[in-house]
Regions:
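A conserved ligand/cofactor-binding region detector
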Residues: 1-256
Length: 256
C-alpha cells in the first residue's frame, strides 16, 4: 500500500464552522527562567518561545431523533506571523514565509512518520499543539461560569485514549502552576481527578517514549514537570512499597 494525500478540503466543507474568535496561542521551544516571587515561591518563566496559533473548526454532531447538537472542535495550526516583511524586502521570498509553512505543517498530516528525528519532533509538536489548544479552550469555558478551581474536576473530565494525548497531563499542571499560581499538591490533586486513561495495547512498539533531549528542546518547562512528578513518584510510591528493589524502581521510573 502507498499512502497518498487526500485534499478533502479543496472545495471547502459546509459542515465545518470556523471560529476564529476562539483561536488559541500555543508556545513551543524556548527556555525556562528560574525565579522566585516576593514570597520566595518558585515561579519559573517560559520565555523566548515560538508562537503558533490554533484556529478552531466546529463539526456539528446530531444524534438520531434527538433535540441536542454537540460540536466536535478540530484545530488548524497557523503561524503567528504569516510573512516576515523585512526578510521579504531583502529578497528572501522563500525564507519570508518559512515560519508560515512550518506552522501549518503541524496539522497537515495526522501522526507524521516518526522514523526520522525531524519526524519525531513534528509528532511531539503536533501532539502538544492539539492538547494545548483543547485544554485552553476547556479552561476558558470553565472560567466563564466558575472561578473556583476546586470545582474543575466536577465540571471537566478528560478521557485519554492511548498514549498520544498524555502530554495533556503536563500541560494542565503547567497552567495550574505557572498561570494560575496554584500550589503543587493542589494542582496535582486537581489533575489526577480530571483525567481518565484507557490503554489499548501493551505492545512495546505501540507505547510511546521520547528522548529527554528532544522533549527538553520542544517543551523545556514540561520536562521539568515530568522530572518532579517522577521524583515524587519514586520517593512517595516506589521506595515505600519496594525500598530494597532498585531494579524494580529503575524499571518503573518515568524518566530513564
Amino acid at each position: 500500500q502507498v499512502e497518498r494525500p487526500d485534499d478533502w478540503l479543496k472545495y471547502g466543507n459546509p459542515w465545518e464552522i470556523v471560529r476564529p474568535q476562539h483561536a488559541q496561542k500555543v508556545s513551543l521551544y524556548g527556555r525556562v527562567l528560574h525565579s522566585c516571587d516576593d514570597l520566595g515561591d518558585y515561579r519559573p518563566q517560559w520565555v523566548d518561545t515560538k508562537q503558533v496559533e490554533g484556529i478552531p473548526y466546529d463539526l456539528a454532531i446530531v444524534g438520531y431523533g434527538a433535540q441536542t447538537v454537540n460540536f466536535l472542535r478540530l484545530w488548524e495550526a497557523k503561524a503567528s506571523e504569516q510573512l516576515d516583511l523585512q526578510v521579504f524586502n531583502q529578497g528572501g521570498y522563500v525564507e519570508a514565509v518559512r515560519e508560515k509553512a512550518m506552522g501549518e505543517s503541524i496539522s497537515k498530516v495526522l501522526y507524521p512518520n516518526d522514523e526520522t528525528e525531524r519526524g519525531k519532533e513534528l509528532r511531539l509538536v503536533q501532539q502538544y499543539f492539539f492538547v494545548a489548544c483543547s485544554l485552553q479552550d476547556m479552561i476558558s469555558r470553565f472560567q466563564r461560569t466558575d472561578d473556583d478551581w476546586n470545582a474543575f474536576p466536577e465540571k471537566v473530565v478528560v478521557q485519554l485514549n492511548d498514549t498520544h494525548p498524555a502530554v495533556a497531563i503536563l500541560e494542565l499542571m503547567r497552567i495550574f502552576l505557572d498561570v494560575e499560581l496554584i500550589s503543587w499538591d493542589k494542582a496535582w490533586n486537581l489533575v489526577r481527578r480530571t483525567f481518565a486513561y484507557t490503554n489499548h495495547t501493551l505492545l512495546p512498539e505501540a507505547l510511546e517514549t521520547w528522548g529527554e533531549a528532544l522533549f527538553e528542546k520542544v517543551l523545556p518547562r514540561h520536562i521539568e514537570i515530568v522530572r518532579e512528578i517522577n521524583r515524587r513518584f519514586v520517593a512517595e510510591e516506589l521506595k515505600n512499597r519496594w525500598p530494597d528493589d532498585e531494579q524494580r524502581i529503575r524499571e518503573m521510573s518515568i524518566v530513564g
